[in-house]
Design a protein with these regions (language model features):
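Conserved alpha-helix/loop element of class I SAM-dependent methyltransferases that forms part
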Residues: 2-21
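A short glycine-rich, Lys/Arg-flanked "PGG" loop and its adjoining helix->strand segment in the class I
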Residues: 102-114
């Protein structure tokens, strides 16, 4: 299991922020990535559809003393921002919640400045059998789960839109009980 500190440290190293970036985390939940990169960028906007999540992240950001953070209630499939607004767009464990993941992907592409960085951190199915198993488990623990995308589906999303600079797939072993406990699954 990869700890929060391990993946946020990895994210910070990967984005190579210069300190002047306007950043956005889409479908942010408690904006784990956004809060982690906040010290390294000019500002971070956390967007989520769920007001309860935004209230949680506001409290967390205040506790952590993060000043350069803002919160927006909005739909990832129709982002409430002008074209080419952000230098860095991040989404973590979100695309598997969308029936049509290309919609939020296109929106993230639209609001990203030319030459900007898009970071997608999500589960990837390496085989159809693994996808079916993972989807069954994810659906039990999270009823908003739709399906895990395959590597080929991710590649198709990026194919025409971006120059891929870093692609990394890491096998992260997860204890089933601790994974289910995250959402209080019986």
């Amino acid at each position: 299991h990869m700890s929060k500190a391990e993946y946020t440290d990895y994210l910070i190293r990967s984005i190579q922020a210069k300190g002047n970036e306007h950043a956005l985390e889409v479908a942010a939940g408690t904006c784990i990535c956004g809060r982690a990169v906040a010290p390294y960028v000019k500002d971070i906007t956390c967007l989520d559809l769920t007001e309860a999540m935004l209230e949680q992240v506001k409290k967390l950001a205040k506790q952590e003393g993060i000043q350069n953070i803002s919160f927006v209630s909005g739909n990832a499939e129709c982002l409430p921002f002008e074209d080419e607004t952000f230098d860095l767009v991040i989404t973590r464990l979100s695309l598997h919640h969308f029936v049509e993941p290309e919609k939020p992907f296109r929106e993230m592409q639209r609001v990203l400045k030319k030459g900007g960085k898009l970071v997608i951190w999500d589960m990837v199915a390496t085989t159809e059998e693994l996808r079916e198993t993972n989807d069954a488990i994810e659906t039990m623990r999270d009823n908003s789960h739709t399906r895990i995308l395959s590597r080929e589906e991710f590649e198709a999303l990026f194919e025409d839109a971006f120059e891929l600079q870093l692609e990394e797939t890491t096998l992260v072993p997860v204890n089933l009980q601790s994974w289910m406990d995250l959402t209080s699954t019986p």
